[in-house]
């Protein structure tokens, strides 16, 4: 699976929430099926994520700049939540983890 292509497809055809505050709200509402964080995501947010049981977290190997580019955005993205994958196979990462 090409992660970047799957992520772009999820953004195009599904429901993906970008940004730390919006992701946190989405998690608290129980809508997030998966959370993706950049390698340089702030440590305090990472530790907050650890308190949520049954939340699948995927660490993107690049920086927030690289994650933004992978999303097709011209800005940094430190974290995002997959609410609905649409036509993407991105949730298959949960099965391989």
From Swiss-Prot:
> A GO BP term, please?
translation
Q: Which GO molecular function annotations are given, in alphabetical order?
A: RNA binding; structural constituent of ribosome
One cellular component term from this protein's GO annotations in UniProt: cytosolic large ribosomal subunit
Give the matching InterPro entries: Ribosomal_eL30 (IPR000231), Ribosomal_eL30-like (IPR039109), Ribosomal_eL30-like_sf (IPR029064), Ribosomal_eL8/eL30/eS12/Gad45 (IPR004038)
Q: List the disulfide bonds.
A: none
State the UniProt keywords alphabetically.
Answer: Ribonucleoprotein, Ribosomal protein
Q: Which residue spans traverse the membrane?
A: none
NCBIfam families, A to Z = PRK01018.1 (NF002172)
Under the heading HAMAP family, the entry gives: Ribosomal_eL30
Query: Which family does the record claim for this protein?
Result: Belongs to the eukaryotic ribosomal protein eL30 family.
- The protein depicted here goes by the name Large ribosomal subunit protein eL30
The organism named in the record is Methanoregula boonei (strain DSM 21154 / JCM 14090 / 6A8)
Q: What is the lineage of its organism?
A: Archaea, Methanobacteriati, Methanobacteriota, Stenosarchaea group, Methanomicrobia
Gene responsible for this protein: rpl30e
């Amino acid at each position: 699976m090409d992660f970047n292509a799957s992520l772009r497809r999820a953004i195009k055809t599904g429901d993906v929430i970008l940004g730390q505050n919006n992701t946190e709200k989405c998690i608290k509402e129980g809508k997030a099926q998966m959370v993706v964080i950049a390698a340089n995501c702030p440590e305090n947010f990472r530790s907050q994520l650890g308190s949520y049981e049954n939340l699948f977290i995927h660490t993107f190997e690049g920086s927030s700049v690289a994650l933004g580019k992978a999303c097709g955005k011209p800005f940094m993205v430190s974290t995002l939540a997959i609410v609905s994958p649409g036509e993407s196979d991105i949730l298959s990462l949960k099965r391989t983890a």
